[in-house]
Every structure is written in structure tokens, then in C-alpha cells.
Amino acid sequence: MARITVEDCLEKINNRFLIVQMAIKRVHQYREGYDPLVECKNKEVVTALREIAAGEVMPADSIEEAGVFLPATK
């Protein structure tokens, strides 16, 4: 597979700091038992970045309401 970077995710999310926070939150979700939304055999952080670049996870309108971004289904 091709390499994935934060720059690849900037097409979907215009804030690189939010992208990093989203990826961290997503890795925590994997460790809590959530399934990945894209097929990827890389490390968890790479899988999270692939999900963001694919538009599978998006930031929530209200961070207080939904955490850092809209949760994926379990």
C-alpha cells in the first residue's frame, strides 16, 4: 500500500492538529474494541489516518457533545 501522511488527510480536514487528535482518539477506540472502518494491516495510527483520509470519520459539530469526532459504530 502507498504511504499515508497527515498531509493526505488535509483534503478532508483542514486542521492538522485536529487530524492528530482524531487519530489518537481513534487508536484509543481500537484498543477499547471498536473495529477499523477501512481494511489495513498496518499499525493502529496508520489505520486511523487511512480512515480520516477516506472520510470515514469526521469531526463533530460540538466537541462537548461527541468528544473529538463523531464516534464509529461498534
From Swiss-Prot:
Keywords: DNA-directed RNA polymerase, Nucleotidyltransferase, Transcription, Transferase. Its EC number is 2.7.7.6. It holds the Pfam family RNA_pol_Rpb6. GO terms for molecular function: DNA binding; DNA-directed RNA polymerase activity. SMART domains: RNA_pol_Rpb6. Signal peptide: none annotated. Disulfide bonds: none annotated. One of its GO terms (cellular component) is DNA-directed RNA polymerase complex. It catalyses: RNA(n) + a ribonucleoside 5'-triphosphate = RNA(n+1) + diphosphate. InterPro entries: DNA-dir_RNA_pol_omega, Pol_omega/Rpo6/RPB6, RPB6/omega-like_sf. One of its GO terms (biological process) is DNA-templated transcription. It comes from the Bacteria. The keyword Transcription applies. Promotes RNA polymerase assembly. Latches the N- and C-terminal regions of the beta' subunit thereby facilitating its interaction with the beta and alpha subunits. The RNAP catalytic core consists of 2 alpha, 1 beta, 1 beta' and 1 omega subunit. When a sigma factor is associated with the core the holoenzyme is formed, which can initiate transcription. NCBIfam families: rpoZ. Belongs to the RNA polymerase subunit omega family. This is DNA-directed RNA polymerase subunit omega. It comes from Solidesulfovibrio magneticus (strain ATCC 700980 / DSM 13731 / RS-1).
